[in-house]
Amino acid sequence: LAAGLRFSPGSDKRHLRRAWQGAVVSVIVLVSCAYPGAQPAGDREHRITLFTQYLESLRIQAGIPGLSAAITANGSIIWEGGLGFADVEARVAAAPHTPYRIASITKTATSTLLMQCVEAGRLNLDAPIRTYTTTVPDPNATVRQVLAMASDAAAGSTYRYDGDRFQALTPVVAACSGVSYRVAVARQILDRIGMADSVPGQDLEAPTEAASAEFDPATLTRYRAVLARIAKPYVVRDGGPTLSEYPPKGINASAGLVSTVRDLARYDAAIDAHVLMSSSTQLVAWTPFRLASGRESPYALGWFVQSTAAGRAVWHYGQWPTFSSLMLKLPDRGVTLILLANSDGLSSRFPLAAGDVAVSPFAHAFIQAVR
C-alpha cells in the first residue's frame, strides 16, 4: 500500500480517488489471494489477522491521527488495537480503552431505547410523532418514519439521511421512558450492560445544575475521569493533523455519546444476546423501511441494513468534523468491526449516507476478509 500518501483539501479529487482505489485494491487482492472464496470458520483468525495488518496503511491513507479498533466474534473480542495517537501533541497512543465521540452511532442507542418502549407497551411506532412531542419538523410524520429517516417531503415516500430531523426523537424517548434522554441511555444501556467507560454527553465534564441532579456524585466523578482521557479532536490539512475544537458537547437522539471500542463491543454482545430487547423486536428494528413506492429503504429503524459479499450487514457510521466512527455487524458471519477515530477520516470522503457500507475502504476490506 502507498503508506506515505497524505490527503489535503487542496488535492485533486481524482488523484485522491485513485489513491484510495489503489489502497483498497491492494488490500482486497492480498486478502482474496490468501483466502479465495468463502472460507471455513476455522480460517477466520488468519483472515482477521491479515485484515488487521493493513489497518495502519488504511489509517494513514484516510488521514486519521488516532484509530481504535475492535473485532468481535460471537460475542467476544477476538482482536483489538490502537493505531496512531489519541493526543498527537502529548504523544498519547490510541488504545482500545480510549474514549471518543461516537457521533451518529448514538442513533442506534436511540433505536434501542425506543424499541424497549415498544416492548413495554409505552410507544406506538405508527402513531404521529406529535402524540409524544410538539417540537417536530412535520407533526404528521409517524415515529417510525422519523426513526427510518423517511419523514422528509411526503412522509414515508423517500429516504433522506437527516440527523437534524432525527433529533426530534429526543423528547419521544423522554416521553416514553419517563426520564431525560441522557438518563435513559445511562440506565437502560450503559449501566445495564457495564459500559463503564461510556458517558451520555461530553458536557458532563462540567455539568449544569440540572444535569448534576440526574446522577449521583460517584457517577459524575466516574464520568469526569473518563472524559479526562477522551481523544483530542483533529482536522487534517496539508497532510497533517491540526488540533481543533470538540463538537457540541451535549447529547440528543442523533449524536453525543462518548464511548470506547471495548464498550461498544459490550454493546454489540448485548445486542446479539438479546439482553436489551427480544429477538423479535430486534428483527423489527433491523427490517428495512418500505417506502410508499414499495421499494425498500437502505435504512431500517436507526440502523442501515444491506446485503454484502459476506451476507447481511447491519451497520452505522458517525461523522463530525473532528471525529468519525463505524460499527459494522455481519450477522451471517457472526463478526463485528468497530472503528473510532479522532478525525473525520472514517466517513467524510465516502457517501455512506446513501446506504452502501462497501464504499468505505475499511468496511470493504473487512467484508472481503470474512466473506
What is each model feature region?
Residues S104-T106, R160-G163:
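Catalytic nucleophile serine of serine hydrolases
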Residues L55-L58, A69, G75, T98-D126, ...:
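Active-site SXXK
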Residues E205-P247, I251-A253, Y299, F304-Q306:
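Carbohydrate-binding/catalytic loop surfaces
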Residues S8-A23:
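Bacterial N-terminal signal peptides that target proteins for export
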Residues C33-G81, V179, A186-R187, D191, ...:
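Catalytic loop of the DD-peptidase/beta-lactamase superfamily, centered on the K-T-G motif
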Residues G22-S32:
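Bacterial N-terminal signal peptides
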Residues L50, G66, P96, R101-I105, ...:
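Active-site helix/loop module of the DD-peptidase/beta-lactamase fold
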